[in-house]
A protein has these predicted regions:
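Short periplasmic/luminal acceptor-recognition loop of GT-C membrane glycosyltransferases, typified by
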Residues: 20, 319-322, 335-390, 439
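Transmembrane-helix motifs of polytopic, lipid-linked glycan transferases
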Residues: 47-51, 55-79, 116, 120
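Specific aromatic-rich, kink-prone transmembrane helix
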Residues: 91, 109-126, 136, 140-141, ...
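Short acidic/glycine- and proline-prone juxtamembrane loop motifs at membrane-interface regions
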Residues: 97-110, 264
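Aromatic/acidic, Gly/Pro-rich catalytic loop(s) in extracytoplasmic/lumenal soluble domains
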Residues: 283, 376-444
Length: 444
Protein backbone atom coordinates (compact mmCIF):
# COMPACT_ATOMS: atom_id res chain seq x y z
CA UNK A 1 0.00 0.00 0.00
CA UNK A 2 2.80 2.42 0.86
CA UNK A 3 4.39 2.09 -2.56
CA UNK A 4 1.06 2.25 -4.37
CA UNK A 5 0.12 5.49 -2.61
CA UNK A 6 3.61 6.86 -3.30
CA UNK A 7 3.15 6.04 -7.00
CA UNK A 8 -0.25 7.73 -6.93
CA UNK A 9 1.31 10.87 -5.43
CA UNK A 10 4.59 11.06 -7.37
CA UNK A 11 4.04 9.02 -10.55
CA UNK A 12 7.27 7.14 -9.78
CA UNK A 13 7.06 3.38 -9.09
CA UNK A 14 10.53 3.38 -7.50
CA UNK A 15 10.51 4.43 -3.86
CA UNK A 16 13.85 5.70 -2.60
CA UNK A 17 16.99 3.68 -3.17
CA UNK A 18 15.70 0.27 -2.11
CA UNK A 19 15.36 -2.29 -4.92
CA UNK A 20 13.69 -5.33 -3.38
CA UNK A 21 10.76 -6.02 -5.73
CA UNK A 22 9.77 -5.00 -9.29
CA UNK A 23 6.98 -2.54 -9.96
CA UNK A 24 3.83 -4.22 -11.22
CA UNK A 25 2.37 -4.80 -7.74
CA UNK A 26 2.27 -1.11 -6.88
CA UNK A 27 1.24 -0.21 -10.44
CA UNK A 28 -1.79 -2.53 -10.22
CA UNK A 29 -2.95 -1.27 -6.83
CA UNK A 30 -2.25 2.38 -7.71
CA UNK A 31 -4.36 1.97 -10.86
CA UNK A 32 -7.29 0.70 -8.80
CA UNK A 33 -6.86 3.52 -6.30
CA UNK A 34 -6.78 6.09 -9.12
CA UNK A 35 -9.92 4.69 -10.78
CA UNK A 36 -11.82 4.81 -7.48
CA UNK A 37 -10.64 8.38 -6.65
CA UNK A 38 -8.88 7.07 -3.56
CA UNK A 39 -6.93 10.30 -3.05
CA UNK A 40 -10.22 12.11 -2.38
CA UNK A 41 -10.80 10.09 0.80
CA UNK A 42 -10.48 12.32 3.86
CA UNK A 43 -10.47 10.03 6.89
CA UNK A 44 -10.45 11.39 10.42
CA UNK A 45 -8.05 10.20 13.10
CA UNK A 46 -10.77 7.97 14.57
CA UNK A 47 -9.84 4.28 14.44
CA UNK A 48 -13.05 3.32 12.60
CA UNK A 49 -12.41 5.99 9.98
CA UNK A 50 -8.83 4.80 9.51
CA UNK A 51 -10.09 1.31 8.61
CA UNK A 52 -11.85 2.79 5.57
CA UNK A 53 -8.42 3.34 3.99
CA UNK A 54 -8.20 -0.42 3.44
CA UNK A 55 -11.72 -0.99 2.08
CA UNK A 56 -10.95 -0.51 -1.65
CA UNK A 57 -7.73 -2.59 -1.77
CA UNK A 58 -9.36 -5.35 0.29
CA UNK A 59 -12.31 -5.54 -2.11
CA UNK A 60 -9.82 -5.71 -4.99
CA UNK A 61 -7.93 -8.57 -3.34
CA UNK A 62 -11.18 -10.39 -2.67
CA UNK A 63 -12.13 -10.14 -6.35
CA UNK A 64 -8.70 -11.47 -7.33
CA UNK A 65 -9.23 -14.46 -5.01
CA UNK A 66 -12.57 -15.19 -6.72
CA UNK A 67 -10.81 -14.96 -10.10
CA UNK A 68 -8.15 -17.38 -8.84
CA UNK A 69 -10.86 -19.89 -7.94
CA UNK A 70 -12.43 -19.62 -11.40
CA UNK A 71 -9.07 -20.01 -13.17
CA UNK A 72 -8.22 -23.08 -11.11
CA UNK A 73 -11.58 -24.59 -12.07
CA UNK A 74 -11.00 -23.97 -15.78
CA UNK A 75 -7.42 -25.30 -15.74
CA UNK A 76 -8.42 -28.53 -14.00
CA UNK A 77 -11.59 -28.95 -16.07
CA UNK A 78 -9.56 -29.00 -19.27
CA UNK A 79 -6.72 -31.16 -17.92
CA UNK A 80 -8.52 -33.60 -15.63
CA UNK A 81 -12.29 -33.26 -15.99
CA UNK A 82 -15.19 -31.53 -14.30
CA UNK A 83 -15.21 -33.62 -11.10
CA UNK A 84 -11.58 -32.89 -10.30
CA UNK A 85 -12.18 -29.24 -11.23
CA UNK A 86 -15.05 -28.95 -8.76
CA UNK A 87 -13.06 -30.57 -5.96
CA UNK A 88 -9.88 -28.55 -6.59
CA UNK A 89 -11.59 -25.17 -6.82
CA UNK A 90 -13.81 -25.96 -3.82
CA UNK A 91 -10.79 -26.85 -1.69
CA UNK A 92 -9.11 -23.62 -2.75
CA UNK A 93 -12.25 -21.69 -1.83
CA UNK A 94 -12.91 -23.17 1.61
CA UNK A 95 -9.67 -24.35 3.24
CA UNK A 96 -8.52 -21.99 6.00
CA UNK A 97 -5.03 -21.10 4.76
CA UNK A 98 -6.41 -19.64 1.54
CA UNK A 99 -7.61 -16.61 3.57
CA UNK A 100 -4.14 -15.28 2.88
CA UNK A 101 -5.10 -14.59 -0.75
CA UNK A 102 -7.37 -11.80 0.53
CA UNK A 103 -4.41 -9.97 2.05
CA UNK A 104 -2.68 -7.07 0.29
CA UNK A 105 0.40 -8.99 -0.84
CA UNK A 106 2.41 -9.15 -4.05
CA UNK A 107 1.75 -12.89 -4.17
CA UNK A 108 -2.01 -12.22 -4.20
CA UNK A 109 -1.58 -9.91 -7.19
CA UNK A 110 0.64 -12.21 -9.24
CA UNK A 111 -1.45 -15.36 -8.70
CA UNK A 112 -4.12 -14.55 -11.34
CA UNK A 113 -1.31 -13.73 -13.78
CA UNK A 114 0.34 -17.11 -13.23
CA UNK A 115 -2.95 -19.01 -13.44
CA UNK A 116 -3.97 -17.01 -16.52
CA UNK A 117 -0.64 -17.81 -18.21
CA UNK A 118 -1.11 -21.52 -17.54
CA UNK A 119 -4.71 -21.47 -18.79
CA UNK A 120 -3.79 -19.64 -22.02
CA UNK A 121 -0.95 -22.07 -22.69
CA UNK A 122 -3.42 -24.95 -22.32
CA UNK A 123 -5.89 -23.24 -24.65
CA UNK A 124 -3.08 -22.74 -27.18
CA UNK A 125 -2.83 -26.51 -27.58
CA UNK A 126 -6.49 -26.72 -28.60
CA UNK A 127 -6.75 -24.03 -31.27
CA UNK A 128 -5.27 -23.08 -34.63
CA UNK A 129 -4.45 -19.56 -33.36
CA UNK A 130 -1.60 -20.81 -31.21
CA UNK A 131 0.92 -18.01 -31.64
CA UNK A 132 -1.26 -15.24 -30.23
CA UNK A 133 -2.25 -17.26 -27.16
CA UNK A 134 1.37 -18.25 -26.54
CA UNK A 135 2.46 -14.61 -26.71
CA UNK A 136 -0.33 -13.54 -24.34
CA UNK A 137 0.65 -16.36 -21.99
CA UNK A 138 4.25 -15.10 -22.02
CA UNK A 139 3.03 -11.55 -21.34
CA UNK A 140 1.04 -12.65 -18.29
CA UNK A 141 3.97 -14.65 -16.95
CA UNK A 142 6.30 -11.72 -17.63
CA UNK A 143 3.98 -9.45 -15.63
CA UNK A 144 3.98 -12.02 -12.81
CA UNK A 145 7.79 -11.87 -12.69
CA UNK A 146 7.56 -8.07 -12.93
CA UNK A 147 5.48 -8.33 -9.75
CA UNK A 148 7.78 -10.68 -7.86
CA UNK A 149 10.89 -12.46 -9.13
CA UNK A 150 10.17 -16.02 -7.80
CA UNK A 151 7.30 -16.25 -10.31
CA UNK A 152 9.94 -17.10 -12.94
CA UNK A 153 9.80 -20.72 -11.71
CA UNK A 154 6.40 -21.06 -13.39
CA UNK A 155 8.07 -20.88 -16.82
CA UNK A 156 8.93 -24.58 -16.55
CA UNK A 157 5.33 -25.80 -16.52
CA UNK A 158 4.15 -23.25 -19.10
CA UNK A 159 7.05 -23.95 -21.48
CA UNK A 160 6.45 -27.70 -21.11
CA UNK A 161 2.77 -27.28 -22.06
CA UNK A 162 3.68 -25.16 -25.10
CA UNK A 163 6.51 -27.40 -26.29
CA UNK A 164 4.75 -30.77 -25.93
CA UNK A 165 1.93 -29.63 -28.19
CA UNK A 166 3.90 -29.40 -31.47
CA UNK A 167 7.48 -30.06 -30.32
CA UNK A 168 8.57 -26.74 -31.85
CA UNK A 169 11.33 -24.62 -30.32
CA UNK A 170 9.83 -21.62 -32.13
CA UNK A 171 6.72 -21.88 -29.91
CA UNK A 172 8.89 -21.76 -26.80
CA UNK A 173 10.78 -18.74 -28.17
CA UNK A 174 7.45 -16.95 -28.72
CA UNK A 175 6.70 -17.57 -25.06
CA UNK A 176 10.14 -16.48 -23.83
CA UNK A 177 10.32 -13.12 -25.63
CA UNK A 178 7.65 -11.29 -23.55
CA UNK A 179 8.48 -13.40 -20.50
CA UNK A 180 12.04 -12.03 -20.52
CA UNK A 181 11.48 -8.52 -21.89
CA UNK A 182 8.77 -7.34 -19.48
CA UNK A 183 10.76 -7.93 -16.24
CA UNK A 184 13.80 -6.23 -17.81
CA UNK A 185 11.96 -2.93 -17.29
CA UNK A 186 13.07 -3.10 -13.66
CA UNK A 187 16.88 -3.15 -14.12
CA UNK A 188 16.64 -0.88 -17.18
CA UNK A 189 14.86 1.71 -15.03
CA UNK A 190 17.66 1.46 -12.48
CA UNK A 191 20.26 1.97 -15.22
CA UNK A 192 18.35 4.99 -16.52
CA UNK A 193 18.59 6.65 -13.10
CA UNK A 194 22.22 5.56 -12.64
CA UNK A 195 21.27 3.24 -9.78
CA UNK A 196 22.23 -0.14 -11.21
CA UNK A 197 24.67 -0.69 -8.34
CA UNK A 198 21.80 -0.18 -5.89
CA UNK A 199 19.66 -2.59 -7.91
CA UNK A 200 22.38 -5.25 -7.72
CA UNK A 201 22.83 -4.67 -4.00
CA UNK A 202 19.08 -4.94 -3.36
CA UNK A 203 18.70 -8.17 -5.32
CA UNK A 204 21.80 -9.80 -3.80
CA UNK A 205 20.81 -8.77 -0.27
CA UNK A 206 17.61 -10.78 -0.55
CA UNK A 207 19.48 -13.90 -1.66
CA UNK A 208 21.86 -13.63 1.29
CA UNK A 209 19.11 -13.69 3.94
CA UNK A 210 18.21 -17.29 4.51
CA UNK A 211 16.43 -19.77 6.73
CA UNK A 212 15.44 -23.40 6.30
CA UNK A 213 12.53 -24.35 4.08
CA UNK A 214 11.71 -26.87 6.81
CA UNK A 215 10.65 -23.89 8.92
CA UNK A 216 8.05 -23.00 6.29
CA UNK A 217 6.96 -26.64 5.91
CA UNK A 218 6.58 -26.93 9.67
CA UNK A 219 4.66 -23.69 9.97
CA UNK A 220 2.35 -24.68 7.11
CA UNK A 221 1.71 -28.08 8.71
CA UNK A 222 0.76 -26.39 11.99
CA UNK A 223 -1.57 -23.68 10.70
CA UNK A 224 -3.43 -25.79 8.11
CA UNK A 225 -2.72 -29.51 8.59
CA UNK A 226 -5.68 -30.52 6.41
CA UNK A 227 -4.35 -28.72 3.34
CA UNK A 228 -0.81 -29.84 4.14
CA UNK A 229 -1.73 -33.54 4.31
CA UNK A 230 -4.15 -33.53 1.36
CA UNK A 231 -1.87 -31.40 -0.82
CA UNK A 232 1.34 -33.34 -0.23
CA UNK A 233 -0.53 -36.65 -0.57
CA UNK A 234 -1.78 -35.41 -3.93
CA UNK A 235 1.77 -34.44 -4.95
CA UNK A 236 2.95 -37.92 -3.91
CA UNK A 237 0.26 -39.41 -6.17
CA UNK A 238 1.48 -37.13 -8.97
CA UNK A 239 4.99 -38.54 -8.50
CA UNK A 240 3.66 -42.10 -8.78
CA UNK A 241 1.70 -41.18 -11.90
CA UNK A 242 4.57 -39.11 -13.29
CA UNK A 243 2.20 -36.21 -13.79
CA UNK A 244 4.60 -33.68 -15.30
CA UNK A 245 2.04 -30.87 -15.21
CA UNK A 246 1.73 -30.92 -11.43
CA UNK A 247 5.38 -31.73 -10.78
CA UNK A 248 6.77 -28.98 -13.03
CA UNK A 249 4.51 -26.53 -11.24
CA UNK A 250 5.49 -27.70 -7.74
CA UNK A 251 9.11 -28.88 -7.78
CA UNK A 252 10.98 -25.92 -9.41
CA UNK A 253 9.43 -23.46 -6.98
CA UNK A 254 10.22 -25.61 -3.93
CA UNK A 255 13.83 -26.02 -5.10
CA UNK A 256 14.14 -22.27 -5.62
CA UNK A 257 12.53 -21.48 -2.28
CA UNK A 258 14.79 -23.92 -0.44
CA UNK A 259 18.01 -22.61 -1.97
CA UNK A 260 17.63 -18.82 -2.09
CA UNK A 261 16.49 -16.12 0.28
CA UNK A 262 14.51 -15.74 3.47
CA UNK A 263 11.29 -17.73 3.59
CA UNK A 264 8.02 -16.66 5.19
CA UNK A 265 4.63 -18.37 5.32
CA UNK A 266 3.12 -16.24 2.53
CA UNK A 267 5.92 -17.21 0.14
CA UNK A 268 4.15 -20.58 -0.07
CA UNK A 269 1.21 -18.95 -1.85
CA UNK A 270 2.61 -19.64 -5.32
CA UNK A 271 2.03 -23.37 -4.95
CA UNK A 272 -1.16 -23.36 -2.87
CA UNK A 273 -3.23 -23.70 -6.10
CA UNK A 274 -1.26 -26.72 -7.32
CA UNK A 275 -1.58 -28.34 -3.90
CA UNK A 276 -5.35 -27.83 -4.02
CA UNK A 277 -5.40 -29.26 -7.54
CA UNK A 278 -3.32 -32.26 -6.45
CA UNK A 279 -5.63 -32.77 -3.46
CA UNK A 280 -8.71 -32.57 -5.70
CA UNK A 281 -7.27 -35.15 -8.10
CA UNK A 282 -6.42 -37.38 -5.14
CA UNK A 283 -9.98 -37.19 -3.81
CA UNK A 284 -11.40 -37.95 -7.26
CA UNK A 285 -9.03 -40.91 -7.67
CA UNK A 286 -10.38 -42.48 -4.51
CA UNK A 287 -13.77 -42.78 -6.23
CA UNK A 288 -12.48 -43.50 -9.72
CA UNK A 289 -10.52 -46.57 -8.63
CA UNK A 290 -13.27 -47.86 -6.34
CA UNK A 291 -11.14 -47.49 -3.21
CA UNK A 292 -14.41 -46.57 -1.54
CA UNK A 293 -17.13 -48.82 -2.96
CA UNK A 294 -20.27 -46.99 -1.89
CA UNK A 295 -20.95 -43.68 -3.60
CA UNK A 296 -22.84 -42.41 -0.57
CA UNK A 297 -19.78 -42.95 1.64
CA UNK A 298 -17.54 -41.15 -0.86
CA UNK A 299 -19.93 -38.20 -1.17
CA UNK A 300 -20.15 -38.06 2.61
CA UNK A 301 -16.35 -37.88 2.92
CA UNK A 302 -16.08 -35.13 0.29
CA UNK A 303 -18.88 -33.11 1.87
CA UNK A 304 -17.31 -33.65 5.28
CA UNK A 305 -13.98 -32.24 4.11
CA UNK A 306 -15.60 -29.25 2.40
CA UNK A 307 -17.96 -28.47 5.29
CA UNK A 308 -15.11 -28.81 7.78
CA UNK A 309 -12.97 -26.44 5.69
CA UNK A 310 -15.80 -23.94 5.25
CA UNK A 311 -16.66 -23.99 8.96
CA UNK A 312 -13.01 -23.55 9.94
CA UNK A 313 -12.58 -20.62 7.56
CA UNK A 314 -15.80 -19.02 8.81
CA UNK A 315 -14.58 -19.27 12.42
CA UNK A 316 -11.53 -17.26 11.35
CA UNK A 317 -12.98 -14.56 9.12
CA UNK A 318 -15.80 -13.53 11.48
CA UNK A 319 -13.21 -12.14 13.90
CA UNK A 320 -11.74 -8.64 13.63
CA UNK A 321 -8.23 -8.95 15.03
CA UNK A 322 -6.84 -5.72 13.60
CA UNK A 323 -8.73 -3.28 15.82
CA UNK A 324 -5.75 -2.66 18.12
CA UNK A 325 -3.63 -1.63 15.13
CA UNK A 326 -6.03 1.16 14.20
CA UNK A 327 -6.45 2.17 17.84
CA UNK A 328 -2.67 2.50 18.20
CA UNK A 329 -2.43 4.50 14.98
CA UNK A 330 -5.29 6.74 16.08
CA UNK A 331 -3.56 7.36 19.41
CA UNK A 332 -0.33 8.43 17.69
CA UNK A 333 -2.15 10.74 15.28
CA UNK A 334 -4.11 12.43 18.05
CA UNK A 335 -1.27 12.82 20.56
CA UNK A 336 1.88 13.69 18.59
CA UNK A 337 2.64 16.52 16.17
CA UNK A 338 5.21 17.15 13.44
CA UNK A 339 7.92 17.98 15.97
CA UNK A 340 8.23 14.32 16.91
CA UNK A 341 10.00 11.54 14.98
CA UNK A 342 7.67 8.54 14.71
CA UNK A 343 9.35 5.20 14.12
CA UNK A 344 7.03 2.52 12.82
CA UNK A 345 6.76 -0.20 10.21
CA UNK A 346 5.51 0.42 6.64
CA UNK A 347 2.15 -0.98 7.79
CA UNK A 348 1.52 2.37 9.50
CA UNK A 349 4.06 4.84 8.09
CA UNK A 350 2.25 5.35 4.77
CA UNK A 351 -0.90 6.46 6.58
CA UNK A 352 1.03 8.87 8.78
CA UNK A 353 3.17 10.30 5.98
CA UNK A 354 1.11 10.02 2.79
CA UNK A 355 -2.45 10.35 4.09
CA UNK A 356 -2.02 12.73 7.04
CA UNK A 357 1.19 14.33 5.70
CA UNK A 358 3.04 14.10 8.99
CA UNK A 359 6.68 15.16 8.93
CA UNK A 360 9.55 13.18 10.48
CA UNK A 361 8.00 9.79 9.70
CA UNK A 362 10.61 7.49 8.10
CA UNK A 363 9.19 4.96 5.65
CA UNK A 364 10.51 2.21 7.93
CA UNK A 365 11.90 2.16 11.45
CA UNK A 366 15.06 0.57 10.01
CA UNK A 367 15.94 3.98 8.53
CA UNK A 368 17.64 4.78 11.85
CA UNK A 369 20.26 2.18 10.92
CA UNK A 370 21.43 4.60 8.23
CA UNK A 371 20.23 8.09 9.23
CA UNK A 372 20.27 9.81 12.64
CA UNK A 373 17.12 11.03 14.35
CA UNK A 374 17.00 14.82 14.15
CA UNK A 375 14.15 15.72 16.53
CA UNK A 376 14.37 16.05 20.30
CA UNK A 377 11.52 13.62 20.96
CA UNK A 378 11.00 10.17 19.45
CA UNK A 379 7.96 7.90 19.48
CA UNK A 380 8.12 4.21 18.53
CA UNK A 381 5.20 1.97 17.63
CA UNK A 382 6.68 -1.31 18.82
CA UNK A 383 4.91 -4.27 17.25
CA UNK A 384 5.93 -7.85 16.53
CA UNK A 385 7.89 -6.80 13.43
CA UNK A 386 10.01 -4.35 15.41
CA UNK A 387 10.79 -6.97 18.06
CA UNK A 388 11.82 -9.51 15.42
CA UNK A 389 14.09 -6.98 13.70
CA UNK A 390 16.03 -5.92 16.80
CA UNK A 391 18.99 -8.02 15.66
CA UNK A 392 19.33 -6.02 12.42
CA UNK A 393 21.36 -3.31 14.14
CA UNK A 394 22.20 -1.88 17.59
CA UNK A 395 20.34 1.36 16.81
CA UNK A 396 16.98 -0.43 17.05
CA UNK A 397 17.75 -1.88 20.48
CA UNK A 398 19.26 1.43 21.61
CA UNK A 399 16.07 3.28 20.61
CA UNK A 400 14.02 0.74 22.53
CA UNK A 401 16.21 1.09 25.63
CA UNK A 402 15.98 4.89 25.61
CA UNK A 403 12.20 5.00 25.45
CA UNK A 404 9.47 4.16 27.95
CA UNK A 405 6.04 2.67 27.38
CA UNK A 406 3.26 5.27 27.38
CA UNK A 407 0.35 3.19 26.10
CA UNK A 408 -0.25 -0.46 25.23
CA UNK A 409 -2.83 -1.85 22.82
CA UNK A 410 -3.49 -5.55 23.28
CA UNK A 411 -4.62 -7.45 20.21
CA UNK A 412 -7.78 -9.53 20.14
CA UNK A 413 -5.60 -12.39 18.94
CA UNK A 414 -4.58 -12.95 22.57
CA UNK A 415 -8.10 -14.24 23.22
CA UNK A 416 -7.62 -17.25 20.93
CA UNK A 417 -5.71 -20.44 21.60
CA UNK A 418 -3.39 -20.44 18.58
CA UNK A 419 -2.44 -24.05 19.27
CA UNK A 420 -5.98 -25.24 18.48
CA UNK A 421 -7.10 -25.64 14.85
CA UNK A 422 -8.31 -23.55 13.02
CA UNK A 423 -7.01 -20.77 15.28
CA UNK A 424 -3.49 -22.00 14.49
CA UNK A 425 -3.86 -19.60 11.53
CA UNK A 426 -3.65 -16.75 14.06
CA UNK A 427 0.08 -17.49 14.29
CA UNK A 428 0.41 -15.86 10.87
CA UNK A 429 -0.99 -12.56 12.18
CA UNK A 430 1.92 -11.13 14.13
CA UNK A 431 0.73 -7.59 13.40
CA UNK A 432 -2.33 -8.20 15.57
CA UNK A 433 -0.38 -8.90 18.77
CA UNK A 434 0.53 -6.34 21.42
CA UNK A 435 1.52 -2.85 20.22
CA UNK A 436 3.42 -0.53 22.56
CA UNK A 437 3.60 3.23 22.13
CA UNK A 438 6.98 4.25 23.54
CA UNK A 439 8.52 7.71 23.72
CA UNK A 440 11.89 9.12 24.69
CA UNK A 441 14.06 12.24 24.60
CA UNK A 442 17.29 12.56 22.62
CA UNK A 443 17.16 9.08 21.12
CA UNK A 444 20.22 8.94 18.88
Amino acid sequence: MRRAVNLLDTGNPQEGNVYDHPYFGQIAIASILAMTHYSELKPSTDSDSLQSLYMIPRIFMGLLAVLDTFLIYKIVQIKYGINAAFLSSSLFAVLPFTWIFKRILLDSILMPLVLGAILLSIYSTKTKHKSMLIIFSGCLLGLAVFTKIPAFTMIFVVAWIVYTDRKKISDVLLLLVPFLLIPLIWPVNAITFDQFDLWQKGVLWQTQRTNSILDVFGFFAVIDPLMFVLGLSGIALAVLRRDKFLLLWFIPFVIFLSSVGYKQYFHWMMIIPVMCIAAGILMESIRKYDIIKKKSVYVGIVLGVLIFGFTSTTLLIINDISDNQFQALSYVLENYNDGVTILTSPVYSWILYDVFERENVPKDYSDILFHPIVTEKTVIMVDEHYRIDLARGPQLQNALDKTTTIQTFEGAIAGFDSKVYPYTNMQANGEATKIEIREGIRVR
